[in-house]
């Protein structure tokens, strides 16, 4: 099995992106499975192009994207990506689409086909806060999750794809005392637990992780 795991570069005025830094700390293998790590730009459409170029070089079984969700206190596997870009801030090349469709011939949404509940529970089993999220926002994180679903539906039917959001790291909140953070090492452990859950079984578990609102 070959796994591609991606992390975004810093955006929104931040000096670091904990998603990328945690991805860099992951090993090159998990068991007998090869892990390739890829930095992608926080730029609408270009982020997809960088991943697609890598997917054309190698035959991947799993593509897992990691992104920063400043303000969340837990690791949050994402359930679904939706077909809209609605950017509150500009991306790293100044693009700020508002209410734009990502793919005109795509579905309204694509659900991750990774075992998202198994992943969530595996992270919690390490003593790390985790929650199954039902919204990846409408910025570049949702954009890339949706694009992965579109690629799976139209060109790469065998891949498993998904997305995990991670919190700020402590150095990012020295001027944001109201924002939660998590150490980079804890994020790394959580992501490794997620990868272990993914390679252990493609089947999800039946457990109540839904939300009332």
Swiss-Prot record:
* Subunit text: Homotetramer.
Q: Name one GO cellular component term.
A: cytosol
Predominant location: cytoplasm
Q: What is this protein called?
A: Pyrrolidone-carboxylate peptidase
GO: which molecular function terms? Answer: pyroglutamyl-peptidase activity
What InterPro entries is this protein classified in? Peptidase_C15, Peptidase_C15-like, Peptidase_C15-like_sf, PGP-I_bact-type, PGPEP1_Cys_AS, PGPEP1_Glu_AS
Catalyzed reaction equations: Release of an N-terminal pyroglutamyl group from a polypeptide, the second amino acid generally not being Pro
Its family remark reads: Belongs to the peptidase C15 family.
State a single Pfam family of this protein: Peptidase_C15
Location in the cell: Cytoplasm
Q: What is its EC number?
A: 3.4.19.3
Q: What class of enzyme is it?
A: hydrolase
Q: What does this protein do?
A: Removes 5-oxoproline from various penultimate amino acid residues except L-proline.
- Annotated active site residues, numbered on this chain, are 78, 141, 165
- Key words, A-Z: Cytoplasm, Hydrolase, Protease, Thiol protease
Annotated CDD domains: Peptidase_C15
Is Amino-acid biosynthesis given among the entry's keywords?
no
- Extract one GO BP annotation from the record: proteolysis
């Amino acid at each position: 099995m070959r796994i591609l795991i991606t992390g975004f570069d810093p955006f929104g005025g931040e000096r670091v992106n904990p998603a990328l830094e945690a991805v860099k700390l992951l090993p090159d293998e998990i068991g007998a499975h090869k892990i390739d790590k890829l930095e992608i730009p926080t730029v609408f459409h270009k982020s997809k192009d960088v991943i697609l170029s890598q997917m054309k070089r190698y035959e991947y079984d799993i593509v897992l994207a990691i992104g920063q969700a400043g303000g969340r206190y837990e690791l949050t596997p994402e359930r679904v990506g939706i077909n809209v870009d609605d950017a509150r801030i500009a991306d790293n090349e100044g693009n700020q689409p508002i209410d734009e469709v990502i793919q005109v011939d795509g579905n309204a949404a694509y659900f991750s086909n990774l075992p998202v509940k198994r992943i969530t529970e595996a992270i919690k089993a390490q003593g790390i806060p985790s929650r199954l999220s039902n919204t990846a926002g409408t910025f570049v994180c949702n954009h890339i999750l949706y694009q992965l679903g579109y690629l799976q539906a139209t060109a790469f039917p065998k891949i498993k794809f998904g997305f995990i959001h991670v919190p700020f790291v402590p150095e990012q909140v020295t001027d944001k005392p109201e924002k939660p953070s998590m150490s980079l090492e804890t994020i790394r452990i959580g992501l490794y637990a997620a990868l272990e859950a993914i390679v252990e079984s493609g089947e999800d578990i039946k457990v109540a992780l839904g939300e009332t609102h």
